[in-house]
Amino acid sequence: MGGNEPENEVAVTIAPYRALSLDGGGMRGIYTAAFLSRLSGHFANGRGKGALDLGKGFDLIAGTSTGAIVASALANGNSMDEVVSLYRKHGAKIFPHRIAGKRSALARVSKGGKYVREGDTALRSALADVLGEVSLADVYHKRGISLAIPTVLMSEHRALVFKKTPKSGSRDDKYPLVDICMASSAAPIYRSLAAVTDPNCPDGPKQIFADGGLWANNPILVALIDALANAAPDQPIELFSLGTCPRPEGEHISEDEVHRSMLDWSLGADVGPLSISAQEFAFDNMARLLAGALSDCGRSIRRIRFPNKPVPASMMPFLALDDTRPEAMDRLIAQANTDADLTKSACDDPHNAEGQMIRRLFEGLEPAPEIPLSSLLASN
């Protein structure tokens, strides 16, 4: 050996940059929260400790629409059980009238404004109870968590991402999480557009936003791009992506059925689920291909979409975006528990690479805070 070479060279392991991507899906957000609660609970019980701080396990959390609500709660330090309770307690007020076919769509023609106005008030109140007045800058500076929340700025009809990361500047620092969630979840037809005060010009006109799911219902590419922008050049990236138990999509259409009217599209209500389904497939595969290409160039990027098994056929009647029936929520929670249990089984298999990646994430989590950031700031 050469005289200048160290005798005991120790390999240095660089901690990965971890990002979480959370899909939109209306009331199916209760599935997302229940899944994370169940899986986190398994690891907490295994360590003989109380609840774990899942939000702190990630450098970046991206969430769209209902995923923005879950993302904000994680960043704020709320338990996922609190989010499940939000959907259970307030879901029927947020979506006071379900669109289930042509007849219910027609019923919305005269009373639709009333329904979405009531839902807007209910959602803002529910979010304020959970998130308080916490801003993007608060969770970044006090919790060390970056957020990226897609929406649509209606004044320019362009995509916009509310974000606070080490390289994002200060544009969005003062926006409260409540306003950001309202902006990202303002689904046309199902809910009101979101009128939000611009904190950089509080005396000016309000900004109007529409649901981020119009362009990024699966925000995995948003998460990947921000991870690439903020991770160190030699830092491995681990990207975790979670859906909302989306229903199997597709329909057989005969040639004589292609001339659909507005009523055949339930006055537009059926377009949203079609867009969501197409986006989720496209964005997930684009992220997979991009991550693979970058990995081939020497950048370490690992990506997990969990759970990734087919949705049981028995779940089909309970997967509408605005289904607030107690039995629908019960079924979503039950399915989340089943899927989380299967994911934990994968984590217990030493030969399952994806399971081991998830296991390392959860085993490194800190205990959950005694109170969320919103309560801490309110008491000061």
Roles of regions detected by a PLM:
Residues 1-380:
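Patatin-like phospholipase
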